[in-house]
């Protein structure tokens, strides 16, 4: 499976506003641009109740990431405790939100594979990729170079199903739909032997996982 770093229509970057160096652009007065920090990001959601900061429009004149501010993108925390069971927590970020550098973002362009922003969101939030990330990450940061190493099932026929399921989950937040997303993602990677109840990778998946990531065994 190709990794994010090898896919030219997926852009993986750090949040555009340096919370220290660009502090003068942060305002408590409402503007057209909401500031999001890492603490605002949860699994599939943005904690709107803790949003109280905005960004002055002048900031857009100095950032080289303006084009990403003006479109929907996927975001995650830049710091996540290494001991957390679920380290990868991605959410859909609407346009006109500016990200502090305590966030990472992933943008996606139109492509011939049928991979849209919702399908990619479901893949990134899967328990499988969370498991994989925990194998390759050795600190509390969610680094862009680590996200670059995540494999994406570009050629799967499940991409449209994953997208539909994610959109359904965003509307209704059904636990059953969340499990269905994980099932479809696992299937997209050619994996069918999972324990959905415990959301864990089982030993019987050893051969499948070796196919996806040959250099890593399940006993790592």
Q: Where does each model-flagged region fall?
A:
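Polybasic, glycine- and aromatic-enriched phosphate-binding surface used to engage nucleic acids
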Residues: 1-161
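Non-catalytic DNA-recognition/assembly elements of restriction-modification systems
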Residues: 1-19, 31-41, 154-220
């Amino acid at each position: 499976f190709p990794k994010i770093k090898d896919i030219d229509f997926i852009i993986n970057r750090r949040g555009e506003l340096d919370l220290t160096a660009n502090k003068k652009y942060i305002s408590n007065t409402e503007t057209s641009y909401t500031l999001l920090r890492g603490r605002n990001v949860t699994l599939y959601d943005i904690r709107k109740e803790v949003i109280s900061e905005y960004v002055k429009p002048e900031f857009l004149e100095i950032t080289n990431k303006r084009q990403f501010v003006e479109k929907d993108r996927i975001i995650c925390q830049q710091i996540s405790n290494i001991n957390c069971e679920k380290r990868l927590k991605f959410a859909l970020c609407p346009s006109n939100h500016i990200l502090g550098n305590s966030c990472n973002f992933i943008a996606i362009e139109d492509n011939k594979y049928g991979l849209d922003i919702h399908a990619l969101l479901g893949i990134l939030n899967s328990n499988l990729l969370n498991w994989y990330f925990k194998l390759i990450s050795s600190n509390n940061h969610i680094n862009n170079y680590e996200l670059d190493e995540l494999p994406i099932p570009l050629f799967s026929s499940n991409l449209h199903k994953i997208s539909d399921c994610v959109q359904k989950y965003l509307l209704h937040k059904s636990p059953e739909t969340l499990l269905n997303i994980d099932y479809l993602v696992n299937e997209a990677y050619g994996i069918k032997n999972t324990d959905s109840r415990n959301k864990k990778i089982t030993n019987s998946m050893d051969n499948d996982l070796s196919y996806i990531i040959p250099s890593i065994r399940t006993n790592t």
